[in-house]
Structure formats: C-alpha cells, structure tokens
Regions:
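Active-site anion-handling motifs in enzyme catalytic cores
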Residues: 1-342
C-alpha cells in the first residue's frame, strides 16, 4: 500500500503520486528521446482524455518526442512501418481496458504486441479485469511471446494478475492523469451535490429517486475528428513531406480533443460543492480540482482497488458502499465545506 507522508494535504498527496510515477517510469525511459504513443481514446469518457493529457504532459516534461500517435480503431496496417524500427519505444495508452470488458482497445493491444513482439513496449498504467479464463489465458500467451513488454498496473490486484496470471514484467504505478498536477474550477458551484454515475457495462449503481444524475456525455468532438481524419488519410497517399504534416496534424487534433473533453468534465464537476461518483476519474479529477467527493465502486472493484492502493489518505475523499451511505457522507462533507465558508 502506498504511504504518503502528507496524506492530509491534497498538494502533498498529488506531489507524492507524481514522484512515484517518475520513480517508476523514468528508469524505463532512460536514454529514450523518441517514442510512439498508441491508443488515443476517441470516445466520450473524460477519464481517458485526462489520462491522455497526463501522458502527453509527462512526456513533454521529460523531453520524450512523440513520433506518431493513433487511436485504437486504427487498422494495424495503417501504422507506419518506417517509424517503428526496433529502436523505437512503443507506449500503449493507459486506462482500465486490459481484459474482456472493452473489446476494441484490447484487440488493438493484442495486434500491436503480436506484430511488434521484439520491440520495447511499455503499457502505461492500467487496471486489469478478465471475466473469462480463456480470454485471460489467450492474452497471457501473447504476453509471454512479447520479448520486451513492461506492464504498469495501477492497483495492487491488477499487479497480482499481471505477474501471477499473465506472467508479465509488471510494476505498480499511479494513474497518468496525476501528471496534470492540478485542474481548474471555472466558476463558483451552483448546487450542493453533483452526481456523476456510470451508464455503461461497468455500472452497478442506480441514481436515487428525484436525483438527476449526470455521466460523461457525447460532446460532438468526434464528428470533427472523423472529418479531419478523412482529409489526413488522403494526405497519406502523397509524398513523405505531406505524410509528416499528417502526423503532426493528427497529434494536435488528438490533444485538442482530449483537452476539450477534459475541461468539459471539469466544468460539469465544478458545478457542485460536493461530488458523488462511481467513476474512477470522477475521483481523480476531483482530487486534481481540490473538490470534496464521495466514491462508490464500479462493477468489478476498480474504484475501491485504486483508492485502497493510492488515495485512501485523502481528506477530500470518502468511500461508500451504498447510495444511502454516499448521501450521508456527502452531507458530512457539505457541512464541513459550509463551516469553512463561515
């Protein structure tokens, strides 16, 4: 379990988590100045955009140049071979999608690991969940064939699965969104409690009657991305100079979309004095914004596993097991918030 010497202070906790990320990742990137970052999250989940922005911030801070990026929907043959020689480090975007719950990123990961199994591949911090033993064993076979694959797990249980069941060279590392260090509140809160609850296959919580719960919503940015991607595919058929323009443009598009989604998420959460959420990055973004909040678990324990590994000492956070308990905990935080205002 992570021990922070300043757990009562949010700034101390965030500083300690950033230090831990550097202690784990910088030795793995020793001597590395160029890499590719694969698996951009082109969907509405703000948490994955927060991770992407944190990854990009970390790599910029430590002067690792990104030669190429793509999303997990990219056909494997579209990945440019001339950029992926055996001296190029492949970074796989982190998150919570190693397993059989979300098929697209897992299939993309397996294709990359199979095609480039002699390359140095670093899986940025992930949660792991397989519901089917056959799927787990199949992925374990891919991991064993991947000669220089390093898996960073973002909770203790994922680390156990990575080492004992996948046979991976694995290390424990916090979520890369913490590399953002802080996020803004754009305006004073307008309501006491914001409920941010999942509406997908990881959901196990129903919003209470008479409560209007939000989730990360479709922002329309993907439509602009789809149009631009068509233009960029045309450029790919032209000489190398235009292909270089394509790579630079695509990276900038990804960054713009990710930051747009993340800041929309900050605006949503910032409407409340207190947040109740079952999303892991509802929790992480609240910490980065300095907001009091209550967390509930998702379908397989991802949120509580992360909390118990890294953030259990946060004075801003309460863990609840039921909606009723979450409301009670939120009321306590709200009362404390109002006392500080007096």
């Amino acid at each position: 379990m992570f021990q922070s010497p300043a757990t009562a202070s949010i700034n101390g906790l965030l500083s300690d988590l950033n230090l831990k990320i550097e202690q784990v990742l910088l030795p793995l990137l020793s001597g590395v100045s160029r890499a590719v970052l694969l698996g951009f999250p082109n969907h509405q989940n703000v948490g994955d955009s927060a991770i992407w922005c944190g990854e990009r911030r970390f790599l910029e801070r430590h002067q690792v140049r990104i030669l190429y990026t793509c999303d997990s929907g990219t056909p494997i043959h579209d990945v440019p071979q001339h950029l992926l020689n055996e001296n190029t480090v492949i970074l796989l975007h982190g998150g919570g999608n190693i397993g059989d719950l979300w098929s697209e990123p897992q299939e993309f990961r397996e294709q990359i690991m199979t095609r480039y199994r002699s390359h140095y591949i670093i899986e940025l911090p992930q949660s792991i969940h397989f519901s089917d033993e056959g799927n787990l064993n199949r992925f374990a076979d891919i991991v064993r064939r991947c000669e220089r694959y390093v898996l960073l797990a973002r909770d203790e249980e994922s680390l156990r699965v990575a080492r004992e069941e996948l046979g991976a060279n694995a290390m424990l590392c916090p979520d890369m969104a913490f590399c953002l260090r802080a996020l803004p509140r754009f305006a004073p809160p307008v309501k006491d409690i914001v409920w941010l609850l999942r509406r997908d296959k990881e959901s196990v919580v129903n919003a209470p009657v008479h409560v209007l719960a939000d989730d990360w919503t479709d922002d329309g940015l993907w439509l602009r991305y789809r149009m631009l991607r068509r233009i960029l595919r045309v450029l790919n058929n032209y000489p190398r100079r235009l292909r270089y323009v394509r790579l630079i443009t695509l990276r900038r598009i990804y960054d713009t979309i990710a930051w747009g989604r993340l800041l929309n998420g900050c605006r949503l959460l910032g409407q409340g004095r207190v947040v109740i959420t079952d999303r892991l990055h509802g929790h992480i973004i609240c910490l980065l914004m300095g907001m009091p909040h209550v967390i509930l678990d998702n379908s397989y324990g991802k949120v509580s596993r992360f909390y118990q590994t890294w953030t259990y000492g946060s004075a801003l956070t309460r863990l609840a097991t039921t909606v009723e308990e979450a409301r009670s905990r939120a009321a306590e935080l709200l009362a404390a918030f109002q006392e500080r205002r007096v």
